[in-house]
Amino acid sequence: MKEKIRLSGVPETMLQTIYARAKESRGRGEIHDAKAEEIIEKLDYDFSLADKDTAMRSGVIARTIVLDRMTKEWLASHPGAVVVNIACGLDTRCYRMSGYAHWYNLDLPETMAVREKLLPESGTISQIAMSAMEDWGSKISEQNVPVLIVIEGLTMYLNAKDVQQIFAVISNRFPKATVFVETMNPMIVKRFKEKSIEGSHAKFTWGVKNGVALAALLPDFRFVEEHSLCEGMAVFAPV
């Protein structure tokens, strides 16, 4: 029996992204996400808009390629680290990575209720059902270990104040954490439209020019480097 999921707004976008990863896994295979394929088979959901939205799908695959590579490289040089995946949705990166001591997936309670049904997790993978703007750090038991925070597919649905609050929560609990955060250029926020995202009644609301501009908003953080989704596109759809 298939699961019927009722979500709207930003939480619903997680269904579009996992569909994109599942479809790519069955196609050219620049990524292979067995968990995504498994989850899609369990869902009773109309993916027709996501199926037609090639722009959304290409973006999801490109960022998956880039963030998978970055996370894998970081974990290789920080064995035994803790990873916190903020706004995880139905992300399955924790199943594609190794070398971490504990992986925490964090999202809003309604989202985590769906994740718990489809991806019940235990052992070195834990669920945190909280807003990224709350003190979720109190749920992390490990101390004095390297910490990586991944924020994917979230900031473009917020505003500058919300983003600053999320980073304040991080710096309060984990002052030495490394953060990988996906952002969107303001011009793209203003002009770009994704059919499947609009179909879920979510809307892009915020962007920042580059990593230096983001760091200027975050006094406790230092900008290190930035990567473009074009790096993922070069693998996914080489010219």
Predicted regions and their residues:
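Hydrophobic/aromatic residues located in beta-strands of well-ordered beta-sheets
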Residues: 83, 103, 179-181, 223
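Short alpha-helix
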Residues: 201-231
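Rossmann-like AdoMet
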Residues: 1-84, 88-130, 142-144
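Short, glycine-/aromatic-enriched active-site segment of Class I SAM-dependent methyltransferases
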Residues: 186-202
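Conserved beta-strand signature within the Rossmann-like core of class I S-adenosyl-L-methionine
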Residues: 148, 170-186
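A C-terminal cap/extension of S-adenosyl-L-methionine-dependent methyltransferases
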Residues: 234-239
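Short SAM/SAH-binding signature in class I
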Residues: 144-156
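A short, conserved alpha-helix within the catalytic core of class I
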Residues: 127, 135-138, 157-175
